[in-house]
Regions:
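Class I SAM-dependent transferase core
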Residues: 1-36, 42-44, 74
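Glycine-centered, small-residue-biased loops immediately flanking beta-strands
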Residues: 33, 57, 131
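Hydrophobic beta-strand segment of the Class I
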Residues: 35, 104-105
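Class I SAM-dependent methyltransferase SAM/SAH-binding core
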Residues: 36-94
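A short glycine-rich, Lys/Arg-flanked "PGG" loop and its adjoining helix->strand segment in the class I
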Residues: 50-54, 117-132
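A short acidic, Gly/Pro-enriched loop at the edge of an enzyme's catalytic core
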Residues: 92-104
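Conserved class I S-adenosyl-L-methionine
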Residues: 132-159
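Core SAM-dependent methyltransferase catalytic element
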Residues: 165, 169-205
Length: 205
């Protein structure tokens, strides 16, 4: 979503529609964790994560749009949060630090990837050995979810596509009004996997 959709991302009714706080409760964020959001946009989710991991923790907020990251920095400053690092990624590389992240979340973002294999390679490399990947995706199985079909994802699709890139699907939580919560752990990547060699571009708030 482009920067023109920023107001929609920050709409007052978003919590009642999506129960973001409930999703964050379900994924086990703890003080001191290092976490990341890929496709963080305005920071609606990333800043809520920052409050949960606290001053001893860190949130890497990734996006490919500098304008979105600027809005995120403004929002973080207004919220008094100093544990957020913005990261300008690319469509092939999230540019997250290697092997340092406990949990990476994608909220209705996976379907936007033009090169999902490359992005998942970078995400896999950024996670610690026991790190987790969490996808929130609108339920394709439910025709009542008022989202365009190509913005939805079924559990079967999520399992097949993401597991092919070195992950193992674990719990699937169906407690949200419209979205799956899909939780993956790392699995060994195939010998054909491309080694992540991206640099890190950080902008401290």
């Amino acid at each position: 979503m482009g920067v023109g959709g920023a107001d929609w991302l920050e709409r007052p009714e978003r919590e009642s529609e999506e129960n973001v706080e409930g999703a964050l409760n379900a994924i086990g964020l703890k003080p001191g964790m290092t976490v990341a959001e890929v496709g963080a946009a305005t920071g609606y989710v990333a800043l809520r994560m920052a409050r949960r991991v606290g001053p001893a923790g860190k949130v890497y907020a990734n996006d490919v749009q500098p304008e979105m990251l600027q809005l995120l920095r403004v929002n973080a400053t207004k919220a008094g949060l100093t544990n957020v690092v913005t990261v300008l990624g690319s469509v092939t590389d999230p540019k997250l630090p290697l092997g340092q992240i406990d949990l990476i979340i994608l909220v209705d973002v996976y379907h936007e990837f033009s090169q999902p294999q490359k992005m998942l390679e970078g995400i896999h490399s950024a996670l610690k050995p026991d790190g987790r990947l969490v996808l929130l995706e609108y339920r394709k199985e439910d025709p009542a979810v008022p989202i365009l079909p190509d913005h939805k994802m079924s559990v079967a699709e999520a399992k097949t596509e993401v597991e092919a890139e070195g992950f193992k699907l674990g719990p699937v939580i169906e407690a949200l009004p419209r979205q799956h919560i899909l939780i993956y752990t790392k699995a060994p990547r195939s010998s054909a996997a491309i080694v992540y060699d991206g640099d890190i571009r950080e902008c401290w708030i």
